[in-house]
Amino acid sequence: MMSYLKQAPYAMNGLGLGGATMDLLHPSVGYPTNPRKQRRERTTFTRTQLDILESLFAKTRYPDIFMREEVALKINLPESRVQVWFKNRRAKCRQQQQQSSTNSKIRPAKKKPSPSRESPGSESSGHFTPPAVSSSSSSSSSSSGSNPSALSGVGLISSSSSGTPVPSIWSPAPVSPVPAPPSLPDISPPASASCMQRAMSSGGGTTGVPSYPMPYNQAPSYAQGYPTSNAASYFGGMDCGSYLAPMTGHAHHHPHAHHSQLSTAAAVSGHHHPHHIGQSSGHHPHHQGYGGTALPFSSSDCLDYKEQVASSWKLNFSSAAADCLDYKDQAAWRFQVL
């Protein structure tokens, strides 16, 4: 109330003044400076006093007036202080008993095993199923492994002729070599073109290439056979069985100067890149070797794209690096990286 009157902004001089202000104005007038009851000074007990009080408390918690007066005379304190000390000592004793009882109730609860823990056997019961190999890569390995006899007559043996697909890269991209001999007029496009024509035939592409039962070597002057041992040592980070990357493989492994020398399916020039292309299929065991002096690529396998599996393989060819075929259905093809 006093602070409210002091803070009142509208109080006139002499009207809104409180008690403390009036004392300053009229120091001779005796106003009560502290209206509250005077608090008793806190009693501090010495060690000897506490020992005497504790000894009496050990005898009885509720001493009578005579005991309290006797102890008050010993410790030189009024009897009321002794009475208050006993009252506080009893309250302290009750508080300690309550804490001990609550602690005894909490301790057995902590010792109980937590139900959230599971036995270690339950975690091992779940079996981890490895991801299934894509149907395209498995069919690639099976088709290439089905006819190893057809591959034996040629120097280029596919690295994945065994049952398991070996990491390799399909690196045919923009190859436009010397046209094929007259005896094989339909094989004038390179291996990538024939593979892509077969892929396009399944998706409504341009033309389908008939299967040739015997392997052939195109352009004997460039044909070089590489053994199987170093086939897996070149570019072993990607698998041809799951996707085709004719454009992308060229962009990564050849300088951009070669892009100007690309040719389409209509005009196949005499220029060729130093590719080493091995193509093995279950129905088309063709092998072509374009072996130059620069960069040998690992022989890789490509599937028979007349199968229905080819409909799930989608390629996306950039217009800057288009070669070998007229891709009429570019929107439907998508390049998929595993």
Swiss-Prot record:
Q: Which GO terms describe its molecular function?
A: DNA-binding transcription factor activity, RNA polymerase II-specific; RNA polymerase II cis-regulatory region sequence-specific DNA binding
Q: Where is the composition biased (Pro residues)?
A: 174-188
Disulphide bridges, residue numbers: none
Question: Which GO biological process entries does UniProt record here?
Answer: cerebellum development; hindbrain development; midbrain development; midbrain-hindbrain boundary development; regulation of transcription by RNA polymerase II; retinal pigment epithelium development
| Residue ranges of the region described as Disordered | 91-206, 261-290
- Entry keyword set: Developmental protein, DNA-binding, Homeobox, Nucleus
- Name the SMART domains for this protein: HOX (SM00389)
From the Swiss-Prot or TrEMBL record, state where the protein is found.
Nucleus
The entry's function note states:
Plays a role in very early embryogenesis, gastrulation, and the development and subdivision of the diencephalon and the midbrain. Establishes and positions the zona limitans intrathalamica (ZLI) in the diencephalon. May play a role in the organizer function. Probably acts redundantly with otx2 in early brain development.
Protein known as: Homeobox protein OTX1 A
Q: What gene is this protein translated from?
A: otx1a
